Every structure is written in structure tokens, then in C-alpha cells.
UniProtKB/Swiss-Prot annotation:
It is found in: Nucleus. GO terms for cellular component: nucleus. Probable transcription factor. Involved in vulval organogenesis. During vulval development, may play a role in the regulation of cell cycle regulators such as cul-1. Positively modulates expression of homeobox protein lin-39, perhaps by binding to regulatory regions of the lin-39 gene, acting in the vulval lineage. Plays a role in larval molting. The lineage of its organism: Eukaryota, Metazoa, Ecdysozoa, Nematoda, Chromadorea. Zn(2+) binds at C144, C147, H164, H169. Residues 440-455 have a biased composition (Polar residues). Keywords: Developmental protein, Metal-binding, Nucleus, Transcription, Transcription regulation, Zinc, Zinc-finger. Residues 70-104, 208-283, 440-491 are annotated as: Disordered. This is Zinc finger BED domain-containing protein 3.
Length: 599
């Protein structure tokens, strides 16, 4: 029995055409000159037997034919005759068979290579990139232009750079936020403009379709009424319809025409008005070829007014896409609505600026009332609190508060107090020290120095000199600067009352500067509540009877109602009121004890 080759079924070759390993071995032995019995044991393995069969020319031709048949059955254009059968061919055929249901290119092939995302090849449109330079590295990082710190950044994510500006460069962060808001407003305006233009175009198309039968009906009616004018009427109607549905080369939409139902005039008048209105509009603006078909004849003055109005509207500088619609009265309301989009956005932006300014002033007032440094604004706890309570509010840094916002608040308070002093004739004047402690501004320190010289050991001799200085300051108040004018606004009675009170308690009993500041705040509080008796009644405040020393009454009033006054200021903050500081409250208690000993 002849031994069959084990690789015949794999190659698809019939057993009759494929020689057995014994025959191949015998042939190989005969070729080598060896004689002997041939068997399968001659070869060390089945693969060696198959390899010996490949050397046969007949087998090689059969293999070539089988390979060509396989390539033809697979249908791959890249495998032609003579292409060797390899593992890649089968793998490619298997992959193609599996991906037949997918549409498109296959990832990982030469037609659709795998992309390796590396930043730097696209245009940077984000506003934050003006403060960063992109590093040409695979890590996708950016370098800050201010502090040269490397920040992780990609083309689609700028969160890291924005956080870096918010935490390290507050002013630049505010500029970026303003630029982003402006760009957002511009985009909203563009979207609104495009939407409005789309609606106007749709309405124009609808109006044109609705008005088409009117022109035809008018032409038919005129042709029936006047046989002699039928040819001219049909020509006019056809020209009107062709000009009405003429496509605008700029936008690609038909030009609008306001056509009203015809009234019962004579056929000759209607045809005349139709041709006149058409020629008039074509002479005014031949590009757009828009017209208004009037049904009744009008006077010469009304026609001139209508021509002037349409000419002004057409020559008004505006968008080319909307200029063609201004001649139609049906679209005039839409154009007015379009013009009101920009003021509405400006109003919202202006309102946000005003709200932010109010919050700035309230924070500055909190710093003044609590006597806290401006650096407290930079603490992460306060910033996170404001970020949670007011997400849209961008808090400036502590340096901005100290350099700009707090001085602005002090100037505003100074103006209000000066207006209160000048406008209230029945009120006792308030000195400038009501606004500040010893560290507010240098102008108030100068006033304190002048008043400290006033309360020296010889009070009686220096009172006359102080009176002369006040008279000179009142005479030169118009030519002095802000500091000297503020000093001259001090009332003479108030100065006399302070000098008399200091002489009463003793010139060296308390530090002069701190005492002047305390008396200024006490005078302000007493004046505020004494002019508001309904507030005193509502708060059930203790009333102090007048004494020989006015400041003694004021000091006793503030001391008796100190807790009520503090609660009132805390609940209803007012720019005209400044609360007592902690050291001033302690000094007030000592002053009251000292007055009780003297009395």
C-alpha cells in the first residue's frame, strides 16, 4: 500500500497527482546514486518528507496553479500571478473579511495612519495664549511669559493656564476675562444677526409667493376691462413679476416687493402708476431692483417725500445683506429690532460693571469697618467663599484694593461728609478726623498735628491764635488745595468745644491724637442720632440731658448706647457712620471714668 502525503489535503491537491514520500525518497536516492529500499522512516520527520517533495518540478507547477487560484478567489487587487503565498496575504484577507460591515477607512493602515497628537500645529485662538509661549515638546507644555513657569497645556484645553493666571497674575487674569467676555458678546451679536437675517429672508420668500397671484390677477382684470391696453398691461405685469422674482447676486434671494390689493381705479391709471413706481425704484437703486407698486395716485409732495425717505434709507451705511430690505415697509420693524440688539448687550455689560463696582465698595467698607489689612483679600478662604456665593464676580487682588478701591471709597466718604456739613445749617459741624484714624491719609495727620499744637499748656493764649488762623483759612478757601479746604471746613464752635473739653479733663490726661480722633467719631455719632429722633425712639436709646460741656453729653450718650449703636451700624451700614475701633472703645471707657471722677 502506498503511503499518502499528509500535506495533500492542506494544499488542495489530489492524491493521484501528489507523489508519496516513499516515491520521492526513492527518486532522491536514485539521483544520489544510492540503491536500497525506500520507506517513510528514511526521513527524520514529516516536514522533511514534505520539503523533499517541494524540490519536484511537477509539484512546484501545481503549487503555482493553486496559489493563482487562491489569489483569484480572494479578489485582492494587489496579489497577481506569481505573488508568493505568505501569512500576510491570509491575514490581510481575514482582516478584510471581518471589516466588511464597517464603512470608511481602517485605523492603523497606510490609508488611515494612527495619529499621534502633539500640540503646536494649529492656530491658537484662545485669549490666554497672549501670556504663554508653547514649548515644542511632546509633553504639550506652555511657558508663562511673566514668571517663566511651565504649565501643562494642549490645543483643546487651556484650563491650566487660566488657573495659573488666576492664582499668580490677577491683573492679567482680569484682562483675559474681559477679552473673553467681549468675544462672547461679539459672537452672540453675530448669531443674533445671522438669525434675524435668516428670518427676514424667509419672510421675503413667503411674501413673494403670496403676492404672485395678485400681479397675475391684476393683469387679467386689466386685460378684460380694456382690450386696447391688454398688451401693455401684460407686458407691465410680466416685467414686474420678473423684476420681483429676480435673484440678488449678493444673497441669492428674491427682492421684496410690497404689493397691495388693487383699488377700483381706471386701467390706464393703474398701469401708469405701476410703470412709474417701477422706473423710479430702478433709478434709485438699480442693483437690488426693489419697487413699491401703488394702487392709488398720490400728490407730487407725497411722492417727493417718499423718494427722499427711500433714498436716505438706501444710502444709510449698513450691512449689504440687510440694505435691500429697507425699502419694504413689512421689514421695517425687523430692522428696528435688529438695531436694538447691540444696545441691549451693552446695557447688560454696563449693569454688570456697576454691580461689580458696588461689591468692590462693600468689600472696601468691610475692611475699613473691621480695620483689616487689604492682604486679607488674597487669602484662599475668602476667595473660595466669594467664588461660591458670587460665581460671576471676579475679585481683584489686595494690592488693587489698597492702591485704588479703598482710596476711592475714602474720597467718596469725604465728599459726602463735606456735603453734609455745608448743606445742614442746623447741625453742628463735623471735623475731618471723623473719616479716619491716625493712619487713614496724610492730610488728616496734618490736621491732627495742627490741633495738637492747639491744646498745649497755655490754652487760653493759643485760642486767639487758632481763631485768627481759622479766619485766614476761611478767606483763602477758594485758592487752597483739597487738604487746606478740608481743614478750613471745621466749625469754630466745634474747635472751641474740643479745646474747652480738653482743658476740662486735663491737657495731659490722654494722648492728644487719639483723643481728637475719638472725639470726632463721638461727635459724628451723636449728630447722626440726634437729628433722627424716630431712630432713637425705635431703638429705645437712652437720652442724656445737656450739660455745661457739650462733649460731655455726647460722650455719655455714646457710652450709654454703645451696644445699640454697634448693632445698628452692623445691621444697616451707612456711609455717614463710622464705628468705634476696639482701642477707641477702651479709651472711651477710661474717658468716662475720668469724667465721673471730675464731676
Amino acid at each position: 500500500m502506498q503511503t499518502q502525503s499528509p500535506f495533500g489535503p492542506l494544499l488542495g491537491i489530489s492524491s493521484s497527482l501528489l507523489p508519496s514520500p516513499v516515491t520521492v525518497a526513492a527518486a532522491a536516492a536514485a539521483a544520489n546514486g544510492h540503491q536500497g529500499p525506500v520507506s517513510l522512516t528514511t526521513f527524520p520527520s514529516a516536514f522533511a518528507a514534505f520539503a523533499s517533495q517541494i524540490r519536484n518540478n511537477q509539484l512546484q507547477s501545481l503549487l503555482q496553479s493553486q496559489i493563482q487560484a487562491l489569489n483569484g478567489g480572494m479578489g485582492s487587487p494587489g496579489n497577481g500571478p506569481g505573488t508568493p503565498l505568505s501569512r500576510n496575504n491570509y491575514a490581510h484577507h481575514h482582516q478584510q473579511h471581518q471589516n466588511q460591515q464597517h464603512v470608511g477607512k481602517i485605523r492603523g493602515t497606510t490609508e488611515y495612519p494612527l495619529r499621534k497628537r502633539v500640540g503646536g500645529s494649529t492656530v491658537k485662538t484662545a485669549k490666554v495664549w497672549r501670556y504663554f509661549d508653547e514649548l515644542p515638546t511632546i509633553e504639550q507644555a506652555a511657558e508663562c511669559r511673566i514668571c517663566r513657569k511651565k504649565i501643562k497645556a494642549t490645543n483643546s484645553s487651556t484650563t491650566g493656564m487660566i488657573r495659573h493666571l488666576r492664582s499668580c497674575h490677577v491683573q492679567e487674569y482680569q484682562l483675559v476675562q474681559e477679552a473673553r467676555q467681549n468675544s462672547m458678546i461679539v459672537k452672540m451679536e453675530e448669531k443674533a444677526r445671522a438669525k434675524l437675517l435668516r428670518e427676514m429672508n424667509e419672510k421675503v420668500i413667503t411674501n413673494g409667493i403670496e403676492n404672485t397671484p395678485i400681479v397675475k390677477k391684476e393683469s387679467q382684470t386689466e386685460s378684460q376691462k380694456s382690450p386696447s391696453a391688454s398688451s401693455s398691461a401684460s407686458d407691465t405685469a410680466s416685467s414686474a413679476s420678473s423684476s420681483h422674482f429676480s435673484t440678488n447676486p449678493l444673497i441669492g434671494l428674491p427682492a421684496p416687493v410690497a404689493i397691495k390689493p388693487p383699488a377700483p381705479p381706471t386701467p390706464s391709471n393703474s398701469i401708469l402708476n405701476l410703470s412709474q413706481s417701477q422706473n423710479q425704484c430702478q433709478n434709485q437703486n438699480p442693483m437690488f431692483q426693489s419697487q413699491n407698486i401703488k394702487n392709488e395716485p398720490t400728490d407730487v409732495e407725497e411722492e417727493d417725500l417718499e423718494q427722499k425717505r427711500s433714498r436716505d434709507i438706501l444710502h444709510r451705511p449698513s450691512d449689504l445683506g440687510t440694505k435691500m430690505f429697507f425699502s419694504s415697509p413689512r421689514t421695517f420693524n425687523l430692522t428696528s429690532a435688529f438695531s436694538s440688539i447691540t444696545p441691549l448687550e451693552d446695557h447688560k455689560f454696563q449693569k454688570k460693571i456697576e454691580d461689580d463696582h458696588k461689591i468692590h465698595m462693600q468689600i472696601a467698607l468691610m475692611l475699613l469697618l473691621d480695620q483689616q489689612p487689604c492682604q486679607i483679600i488674597d487669602r484662599p478662604g475668602i476667595r473660595s467663599l466669594f467664588k461660591f456665593v458670587l460665581p460671576e464676580y471676579h475679585m481683584p487682588s489686595g494690592d488693587v484694593f489698597q492702591a485704588t478701591i479703598v482710596p476711592q471709597l475714602l474720597n467718596q466718604m469725604k465728599q459726602q461728609i463735606e456735603a453734609l456739613v455745608h448743606n445742614s445749617s442746623s447741625l453742628s459741624s463735623i471735623p475731618d478726623q471723623v473719616m479716619t484714624s491716625s493712619s487713614a491719609t496724610s492730610s488728616y495727620e496734618d490736621v491732627s498735628v495742627n490741633e495738637s499744637q492747639m491744646a498745649g499748656p497755655n490754652v487760653g493764649d493759643e485760642e486767639e491764635e487758632i481763631m485768627e488762623e481759622e479766619v485766614e483759612e476761611d478767606e483763602n478757601v477758594e485758592i487752597e488745595d483739597d487738604t487746606s479746604s478740608a481743614s478750613s471746613s471745621i466749625d469754630t464752635d466745634t474747635c472751641d468745644a474740643m479745646a474747652s473739653f480738653i482743658h476740662f479733663i486735663g491737657n495731659d490726661a490722654f494722648p492728644h491724637d487719639e483723643l481728637i480722633s475719638l472725639l470726632s467719631v463721638v461727635t459724628n455719632l451723636f449728630t447722626y442720632f440726634s437729628t433722627r429722633p424716630h431712630v432713637q425712639t425705635h431703638l429705645q436709646m437712652t437720652i442724656i440731658q445737656p450739660t455745661s460741656q457739650p462733649l460731655v453729653q455726647q460722650v455719655q450718650f455714646v457710652t450709654s448706647n454703645l451696644s445699640i449703636i454697634s448693632d445698628y451700624i452692623r445691621q444697616t451700614p451707612d456711609m455717614q457712620l463710622l464705628p468705634l475701633a476696639v482701642n477707641q472703645e477702651a479709651m472711651l471707657e477710661k474717658l468716662v471714668d475720668h469724667i465721673d471722677q471730675l464731676v
